[in-house]
Amino acid sequence: MIDTTLPLTDIHRHLDGNIRPQTILELGRRYNISLPAQSLETLIPHVQVIANEPDLVSFLTKLDWGVKVLASLDACRRVAFENIEDAARNGLHYVELRFSPGYMAMAHQLPVAGVVEAVIDGVREGCRTFGVQAKLIGIMSRTFGEAACQQELEAFLAHRDQITALDLAGDELGFPGSLFLSHFNRARDADWHITVHAGEAAGPESIWQAIRELGAERIGHGVKAIEDRALMDFLAEQQIGIESCLTSNIQTSTVAELAAHPLKMFLEHGIRASINTDDPGVQGVDIIHEYTVAAPAAGLSREQIRQAQINGLEMAFLSAEEKRALREKVAAK
C-alpha cells in the first residue's frame, strides 16, 4: 500500500513518545533508576499500550517511563539519535520529530535549553549517519501550565534556527488554546510554522480556536472536525492539513474502531490529510503498519492511501524547492 516511487513521510511523530523499551531498560540500569520490571518482556506492558486506554490522559501516562530514565543530556542525545535510526529502519525519507523539552527535563531537573540542544545534536548526528531528512517541532506541554510553556518557548527561541514549528500538546480539555495566545504570537514573530493538537479530546471548537487564534497551518489529530461541516469546508478550502494518527486514536479511545475513523471522509471531502504514527514506541507500531494495516482497516482505498502519502509531503514544513528535491531523490532510486 506504500507507493515506493513517492517520498514516505511521518510528520506527526513524538520523539519523546518513541523511546525504545530496550533503551528504557538500559538507561534505567545505567542511572540506577527503579523500573517496574527488570526484563524487556516484563517491562513492555508498562511502557507500551497493550489494550486501548480509556482516554488520552491515561494514554499519556504510558510515556512517563521513557522520560523518567532521561537522567542526563547524553541520554536525551541518545534517544534523539535512535529516533532517526528508527525512521531509517522504517523506510522514511522525511520525518518531523516533535518534542517537549520541559517534559523530558522534568524527572531529573535537567536544563530545558540543554535538552533542546541535546536533541538537536542527536538528530543532526542521526541524519548524517542514516541519510534521513528531518526537521524539529517544539512542543509546549499545556498540561504543565502557561509558565512552564513559557520556559519551553524560551528554550526553543534560543535555538530558533534549528526549530521549524511550534506545537501545543497535552491536556486539551483542561488547558484550552486561549491560554497560550502570547506564546504563539512570539512563535509567528520567529517565522516558525504552527501546528496544534486539537479536536482530539475536545470538540471542533478547539480546532477553530487553533486556526483563528493561534494561527495553526496544520492540526494534529483533528478527528472532531467531522462534527462540523462548515469546519470541514474551511479546512479543504484553506488547505489546512490534518495530521491523522489512526492507531493512536483507537488506543486513546478517541475513536471507537478503525472502521469509524474519519480519515476516509476527510480525504473524500478534499481535506489535505496524511497518515502518521504519533508515539510509535509507546504504541508498538510503525509507519508501515499504519499504511498497510490501519489504513485499509479504516476503509481507505489504495488510491486514497496514495493520496494521503502525497499529502504527507505537501503538508510538510519544507520549502517548495526542498519538496521538489526530495521527490527527485526518491524517483531516481
Swiss-Prot record:
MF-aspect GO terms: 2'-deoxyadenosine deaminase activity; adenosine deaminase activity; zinc ion binding
Pfam families linked: A_deaminase (PF00962)
Positions contributing to substrate binding: H14, D16, G170, D279
A single GO cellular-component term on record: cytosol
Cofactor binding: number and manner: Binds 1 zinc ion per subunit.
Class of enzymatic activity (EC top level): hydrolase
Signal peptide: none
Superkingdom of this protein's organism: Bacteria
Binding site for Zn(2+): H12, H14, H197, D278
EC number in record: 3.5.4.4
Cofactor(s), names only, from the UniProt record: Zn(2+)
Reaction catalyzed: adenosine + H2O + H(+) = inosine + NH4(+); 2'-deoxyadenosine + H2O + H(+) = 2'-deoxyinosine + NH4(+)
InterPro entries in alphabetical order: A/AMP_deam_AS, A_deaminase, A_deaminase_dom, Ado/ade_deaminase, Metal_Hydrolase
Residues of the site described as Important for catalytic activity: H221
Active site: E200 (proton donor)
Coiled-coil intervals, chain numbering: none
Keyword annotations of the record: Hydrolase, Metal-binding, Nucleotide metabolism, Zinc
Its job: Catalyzes the hydrolytic deamination of adenosine and 2-deoxyadenosine.
Family label: Belongs to the metallo-dependent hydrolases superfamily. Adenosine and AMP deaminases family. Adenosine deaminase subfamily.
PANTHER family, alphabetized: ADENOSINE DEAMINASE
Protein name listed in UniProt: Adenosine deaminase
Gene: add
